[in-house]
Amino acid sequence: MGRLAKLVNTEEKIIEFKKYYGFPKDVHIWYVSYGDLAFIQYQDLVLPIITIVEGGVRIPMHPFLIQFLIHFRLSPLQCVPNVFRVVMGTAILMDKLGLKLTIHDMTYVYRLQKTGRNQYTLVARNFDKKLVIGLPDSSKGRDEDFLVITGNWQNPFISCPLIPWELGFRRFTHPLFSFCLIIFLY
């Protein structure tokens, strides 16, 4: 068990956690350690606990966070905690200041970079220009605790990807394209 497991290690603490972080009553959660993630099906939302505690993620998920995940074809498991901090910090700025920022505005300031654990992080393109400041340098050891979220957790207007993708170029495999390519090469 990781450091944040103590927040949800009993039924009473789960009820308290759900109440404190504003989970709807028809949403159910349970704790899963990093080693048990392989047994989880991709129909349930799985989030590191730190994304809720420090990253500002709430259920149902903010539309801007879902748009970010869809844009980059990422599941929440593929993002390090700082991604949630930056995206949710930007979403809060938009809500508080009435801004209409897009994912493209965000990628003007940040770039998505792959980490060593096949996860992705956001890195500022210019050290002096950031949307969200005061982020910790590392969340090492704090992303080992996960919540499996079931029930009515989805945003009613837009849904988030749950199956991990690999970023990069995908091969176009339409049969007509392959046929035309073969003719072109001869």
Predicted segment positions?
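Residue-register detector that marks a fixed positional context within folded domains
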Residues: 1-186
